[in-house]
Curated annotation (Swiss-Prot):
GO MF entries: ATP binding; metal ion binding; methionine-tRNA ligase activity; tRNA binding
Record-listed E.C. numbers: 6.1.1.10
Subunit structure: Homodimer.
UniProt motif ('KMSKS' region) ranges: 330-334
Protein's name according to its UniProt entry: Methionine--tRNA ligase
UniProt GO cellular component terms: cytosol
Locus of motif 'HIGH' region: 11-21
Entry cofactors: Zn(2+)
């Protein structure tokens, strides 16, 4: 039994998942399900990537805390994964004490090995927003390939990485202004010092995809650079120890460590020894990271370097997948092809998309096109027309005429052998992540099964006298071929297979048993396992997507301007007659017999005045002593039954509360307000 730990890239918790995301998660889930059917101890972990400026700013725009935002999207992501039958063994988060402990421990180990340095660097700064701009909040032209509209850390066209200050014609995505440069002290990880570690890892990695190896060779040729692992406050994340929360760990430092935290959390819950899978000496275990091709740089350079220098096992391999296009073009909100996972799930079953993706996925880093017309045709033809149809054509005869019991003899041993002989080839295809090849092999067997049924025509045999035994044997062989096909498809379409298992009265728990025929076995009554996709369902997905983004982009209705009950207009000269002064409250006390008044003694810089103020409902006397406020110093004294009031303190109110005015720090008693 192999010990395998599989991670998938952590989804960023500031928005909903779309079908492009699901491509990678479906790929890894199929592989994990296959490994578990093989009898291997395969643990599948993931979690939410929850730090960074995008989350901080989005939360601010929504009027909620970053913690509330990431909780909201983490829950939505997990529900999408569950409904798409992505079966993680543990789903965690990067924003918790366990991950913080791991991040700080790894940072301290790197620092103790002199792999962390500090230096002042020029940073992009938005003078309008008054903040340093993280990489992803600067856009411009790539300095390498000159592609436009690229982020400040890496180019999505050529894959190059660079500093935001290297961008051509940079602009702030917050204000649209051209950022200026300001110096700030940052923390750097000495990646060049670990070049040998990375190259040793690459040379020992026999499973590394050629495209990844070629890209790594290109980066080595360009020369490795020290990696900036810090970001300036304000920032949502973990503060770097000893910086008084002015510097924070860059999200790409703590995000991969979320893999470790998620697995440690799983180990704690299930009494598993962490070191057996991810210790430095755990040579017998296997560690695989499934990622998108846009984050190879972080997983195949930085991550092995960090792990190798801090006592952790390096990945057995990193498997990258390509991007998703729809109808041959980049996903588009206006065309309705930027389809969110939930929009799909509201209209169609997940099995169809899982199968379609599997029929296109290989071990290469190829972009996958979701051709919607072909998606409908293939789902209806393969799942419904080929596989499920075999059972529907044979089950009724077995259930009604032969007491729901399969024959004790195999009618066509040669055909049975062909189904069995393909087991090794299908197994190898799944193991190597050549899912498209596995699907082709399975569908070729489905074609043979349907040809067998078409040739023998059990529906005609059933009408002929003396052909009962042949009908029994032909239909039993048909059900058995269906059983083998459905077992091979279990990693791909688990919910349909679960229904088939109930019909067959078995449970596929061993991959080795997949090609075995059932003899004298009792089945249940057949019920439809899948229905054909109607084109209208797909059209509705596109329409729902268009409407969703139209609503997002529609201008907000103009709010009615609030109306203020402004007093009658006065001249400037009239206003200047009012002498407003800074006053310090030296004494404050209750007024006996007064429900609303407090007695205040005010110091105006050597001159003392007594004022009765109607602020008792809002303030305790002891809380006011020592505060500075603003008073009308030249208001005619007013004799009250409690004493003489020699002015008025200024306060604001809306009928719900009272707020005395306080001047800015530095204002002194007696200063005139102008």
């Amino acid at each position: 039994m192999r010990k395998i730990l599989v991670t998938n890239a952590l989804p960023y918790a500031n928005g909903d998942l779309h079908l492009g995301h699901m491509l990678g998660y479906i790929q890894s889930d199929i592989w994990v399900r296959f490994q578990k059917l093989q009898g291997n101890q395969c643990i599948f972990i993931c979690g939410s990537d929850t730090h960074g400026t995008p989350i901080m700013l989005k939360a601010k725009s929504l009027g909620i805390t970053p913690e509330e935002l990431v909780t909201k999207y983490s829950n939505r992501h997990l529900q999408d994964f569950t409904d798409f039958e992505i079966n993680f063994d543990n789903y965690h988060s990067t924003h918790n004490s366990l991950n913080k402990e791991i991040v700080e421990d790894i940072y301290n180990k790197l620092n103790n090995k002199n792999l962390i340095s500090k230096k002042a660097i020029a940073q992009a700064y938005d003078p309008e927003a008054k903040m340093f701009l993280p990489d992803r909040f600067v856009k411009g032209t790539c300095p390498k390939c000159k592609a436009e509209d690229q982020y400040g850390d890496s180019c999505e066209v050529c894959g190059a990485t660079y500093d935001p200050t290297e961008l051509i014609n940079p602009r702030s995505v917050i204000s649209g202004q051209s950022p200026i440069q300001k110096n700030s002290e940052h923390f750097f990880f000495d990646l060049p010092a670990l070049e040998k570690n990375i190259k040793d890892w690459i040379e020992s990695n026999t499973l590394l995809q050629p495209e990844v190896a070629n890209k790594l060779a290109e980066w080595f040729e360009q020369g490795l650079q020290s990696w900036d692992i810090s970001r300036d406050a304000p920032y949502f994340g973990f503060a770097i120890p000893g910086t008084n929360e002015q510097k924070f760990f860059y999200v790409w430092l703590d995000a991969p460590m979320g893999y470790i935290a998620s697995f440690k959390d799983y180990c704690n819950k299930n009494n598993i020894n962490f070191g057996d899978f991810w210790g430095d000496s755990s040579s017998e275990s296997e560690l695989y990271h499934f990622i998108g091709k846009d984050i190879i740089y972080f997983h195949a350079l930085f991550w092995p370097a960090i792990l190798s220098s801090t006592g952790y096992k390096t990945p057995t391999s990193v498997f990258a997948n390509g991007f998703l296009t729809v109808n041959g073009k980049k996903m588009s909100k206006s065309r309705g092809t930027f389809i969110q996972a939930r929009t799909y799930l509201d209209n169609l079953e997940p099995s169809y998309l899982r199968y379609y993706f599997a029929s296109r996925l290989t071990s290469r880093i190829d972009d996958i096109d979701l051709n919607l017309e072909e998606f409908v045709t293939k789902s209806n033809s393969d799942i419904v027309g080929k596989v499920v149809n075999i059972a529907s054509r044979c089950a009724g005869f077995i259930y009604k005429k032969f007491d729901a019991t399969l024959s004790g003899e195999i009618f066509d041993p040669e055909l049975e052998s062909e189904f069995s002989k393909n087991h090794d080839a299908i197994t190898q295809a799944f193991e190597k992540r050549e899912f498209a090849h596995a699907v082709r092999l399975i569908m070729a067997l489905a074609d043979k099964a349907n040809q067998f049924i078409d040739y023998h025509k059990p529906w005609q045999l059933a009408k002929e006298e003396g052909q009962e035994q042949k009908v029994h044997q032909v239909c039993s062989q048909g059900i058995n071929m269906f059983k083998v096909l459905i077992a091979y498809l279990k990693p791909i379409i688990p919910s349909i297979v679960a229904e088939a298992e109930r019909f067959l009265n078995i449970q596929f728990i061993s991959w080795a048993d997949a090609p075995k025929f059932l003899i004298n076995h009792k089945i249940d009554k057949f019920k439809p396992l899948a229905t054909r996709i109607e084109k209208e369902k797909v059209d509705k997905i596109l329409e729902d997507t268009k409407k969703m983004f139209e609503n997002e982009q529609a201008p907000q209705s103009k709010k009615e301007e609030p109306k203020l009950d402004i007093a009658a207009e006065c001249t400037f000269d009239d206003f200047m007659k009012v002498d407003l002064r800074i006053a310090k409250i030296t004494e404050a006390s209750h007024v006996e017999g007064a429900d609303k008044l407090l007695k205040l003694i005010l110091d105006l810089g050597g001159v003392t005045k007594q004022v009765f103020a109607g602020i008792k409902s809002a303030y305790k006397p002891e809380d006011l002593i020592g505060k500075h406020t603003i008073m009308v110093a030249n208001l005619a004294p007013r004799k009250m039954k409690f004493g003489m009031s020699e002015g008025m303190v200024l306060a604001a109110g809306d009928g719900k509360g009272i707020y005395i005015l306080e001047p800015h720090e530095g204002a002194q008693p007696g200063m005139r307000v102008k």
